[in-house]
Amino acid sequence: MWPFRKRDSAAEQLMNEAIRVARASVDGQPIVAQGGGGGVETRWRGASRVLRSVASWIPGLGSPRRDFNHSERRMLVARSRDAMRNHLIARAAITRLRTNVVGTGLVCRAQVDHDALGLTEEEAEQLNGQLDRLWSLYADDPRECDAEASLNHYQLQALVLVSSMVAGDVFVASPDQERPGCIFSTRLQLIESDRVGNPNGGMDRADLVEGVEFDGLGAPVAYHVCTGYPGEHLLGKSLQWERLAVFGAETGRRRVLHVMADKERPGQKRGAPYLSPVLEPLQKLERYSSAELMAAVISAMFTVFIKKSDGFNTNNLPMSALTEEQAGGDDTSDGAIALGEGAIVDLGVGEEPMIANPSRPNAQFDPFFTAVVKEIGAALELPLEELLLHYSSSYSAARAAMLQAWRFYSLRRWWLACDFCQPSRELVIDEAVARGLVDLPGYNDPAKRKAYCQAIWIGPARGAIDELKEANAAGKRIEIGVSNETLETAAMTGEPWQQVIRQRTREVTYRREHNMQALPKSGLESPPDHNPKEE
């Protein structure tokens, strides 16, 4: 039977060994003369070391720490901040994210899991309203939520997004501080990435990288934060390093949030700026655009040169012509000739002007500029139309660009809600339960705690080019059963459907009480009439 295999003889074993060696020698031969022009020594052309197109492209392999070390990260952050300040396209990309991802803020709507908690839908709705009111008390007041008492939670959302995109990451501590007139003591303290690092600029360790201390599985344990900015010395304040534990020792609550722009590799401890891949083309494009703008300015200058012959006699000029130039003229303090708007330059005897015509505006500037911006936008996941706010194509093309950009905005919105909004809300619910502001039976159970803390975060609506077409499409999706009124209302208005329908019911009731038409003929169904005699 097959389990009892006959043992090979010595001759057969020698033959099998010879065959194995022969096959190995054949398989190990270099491959030559691949198709497509020019021979290569590898099976994959991208791995070749002899092709001229890739001969000088020999990157190294390294760990996430080596490939994104301290010095490179600091340079990327510095250049990203400078681009945000001075580069038009870079600032447009960041502000476009802030406006469309956060806008006026992500509004929280509690959605407790009533099935897991054993509640009826009516009881769950009452509890949702109670939790929403508590959250509004905290989120709407800067003194409640912000450690600096300057921004409410919705403004903090925008600041967290911008800081993480520009610097790569931002940290949020949650110190407890009692304030007169405040209900809660949980404060949100934003910490810039510059302040998080190894104590006293020390070297990385096996369990400490760039100020992030982690355990054997790579989970963060603590963050090392400087009391100020390294390299900045203020009178009367010395720089010290504080170790902030990520989780509470007794409760296990999250005490420090780490909001990263992107985590692209397992084991990566710090985030890279959003603009990192496009910093080089951004800088070149900014220089090119500035040079073209300056050339156009010079070309627009109208300057008159007065050329004097050898026999020119200044005695024939009136005295006013010999006086000094007034402020704003073309005369400079060092006697140099300068161009100006409508300037008149007096040349010396024998001097002759040489005009260099810059031929501006350059007809090739716009196509080239647009092509480069398209590449930058593709790397940033922003279509050209959305990045430049230039919707000059057809309706279908403009709508496709908006939809593609909206996918990216939705991703960033979900990321912000997961990393900042929802964790900060859970901290507030924890404190509300501890203070007795809300009764949540079984909250100490981790499963029930998650059921109580469930919520949705609703941001500004997507917007539409043709609202009538979008409304008709929404109605059709509801009609054929692929969507519902809750989803469509949130997508089109950014408001919860329950809140919209309650307000609409109040409006219809008010109009009926004043003998006004309740709804247009093409409107939604009106609420049931409890007094048919009125009709």
Q: PLM features: what roles do these ranges have?
A:
Residues M1-L117:
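N-terminal-proximal low-complexity accessory segments that begin disordered
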Residues W2-V26, A400, Q404, W415-E535:
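C-terminal anchoring/interaction modules
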Residues E125-N128, E341-I465:
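Surface-exposed loop-to-helix/strand elements on domain peripheries
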Residues E148, P175-D176, A296-M301, L387-Y391, ...:
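Short coil/turn segments at secondary-structure boundaries
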Residues G218, I376, E488:
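Acidic/polar, glycine-anchored loop/turn motif associated with catalytic or activation segments
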